[in-house]
């Protein structure tokens, strides 16, 4: 399945949670989910009982859409997490968090992961001094992530940094906002990653 490219706020209404897809509108309380907190469609306000499989599938879809990955990418990451020693669900979340586009978002240089992905693909981001234009690039602990010189005054990046003052920066990155760079200091612990996803259902889905 290809990456979803439709109206992103419909996804949030479908799942009933914020997926951080419309950063500034969400912070201002103006997102579609804030205005209409029920699924889209004629019968969206009705809540039916969801099956176990439906619950598992929903959690997988939430994670996919939140991090902006395709089905193929998601399956590959899950397979890698399953091969490693440790909690598969936690390892999956850590692998998703290590994506370059996500790190750019976590450092506050973009209001959404979608915009962070655009910054990466358009060549606005350096990793340890080298330009990297692959959103799925895996960032290792200690890596320096920097906005290229000519883009440091980009108004959208500046606005994102201003909004970060409202939400704060996650504990596993150190950021020099004025200089437009940050260090990915370590992999996050699961309890530090505040996302509306219950990864145990994803593990159950792929373990069938």
Curated annotation (Swiss-Prot):
Record-annotated S4 RNA-binding domain positions: 98-163
UniProt GO cellular component terms: small ribosomal subunit
Gene Ontology MF annotations: rRNA binding; structural constituent of ribosome
Domain of life: Bacteria
GO annotation, biological process: ribosomal small subunit biogenesis; translation
Stored Pfam families: Ribosomal_S4, S4
Keywords: Ribonucleoprotein, Ribosomal protein, RNA-binding, rRNA-binding
Gene3D superfamilies per UniProt: Ribosomal Protein S4 Delta 41, Chain A, domain 1, RNA-binding S4 domain
NCBIfam families xref list: PRK05327.1, rpsD_bact
Complex and partners: Part of the 30S ribosomal subunit. Contacts protein S5. The interaction surface between S4 and S5 is involved in control of translational fidelity.
Role noted for this protein: One of the primary rRNA binding proteins, it binds directly to 16S rRNA where it nucleates assembly of the body of the 30S subunit.
Family: Belongs to the universal ribosomal protein uS4 family.
UniProt protein name: Small ribosomal subunit protein uS4
